[in-house]
């Protein structure tokens, strides 16, 4: 549960307790959390003080990130670092259409980052996202181009020079959805704002997004919308129909955090 460690920790505790209760008759069984403290991303290993923590050294400098990035760019990992069964699975997956789509996405990300190699500093991007809800529905768009081509996303984008965050959010909302709700009504429906800044939330690089929550007045019909600009289409989706694998980057978690679904 990105952006809500308490929920994630609770889920892990409950899952471990369920397994322990089935396989151990001891009142106080010993539970060990075994992992490698690689960097800041390993902070979760410190979230369970009730269990014994066992730190292990890195094994032969293996890391999943370069293996995964290389594979998505068409390179098979060396067979001496993976079990043969895993190698077979990865080779078979390369023949599927979904792999080719992932490879094109990885190439786009690689080229995107290379375009910033000449910058004197590693860039930090600032974006905005509109979380618009009405009558149990969320307003989404289908992305027209990479990254995330074909995925559902919140209306949003980069902040232009000389505009405030809220103005950027409303501009992107109108450009991508053609939402006809008057601007004064949008301002009156603004229920919250939150920064989402997980360092790894975007494959493009360090991207900090400011999400604005608009809770429109309930009605028997939803406002008409139409995809525009970077959006192939715009539509209303019941909140109960959200599927994390269909949403771009961390937008599923942003929606859950902003709407109180956690």
Regions found by a protein language model. Give the residues of each.
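N-terminal strand-loop-strand
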Residues: 110-154, 181
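Nudix hydrolase/Nudix homology domain
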Residues: 73-107, 149, 205, 209-262
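Nucleotidyltransferase catalytic core that binds NTPs
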Residues: 1-111
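Short catalytic/ligand-binding loop motif for oxyanion handling, primarily in non-cytosolic enzymes
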Residues: 40-44, 62-64, 147-150, 202-204, ...
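Active-site segment of metal-dependent pyrophosphate-handling enzymes
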Residues: 133, 170, 178-222
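Hydrophobic alpha-helical positions that pack around
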Residues: 155, 169, 173
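Short histidine-centered catalytic/ligand-binding loop motif
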Residues: 152-163
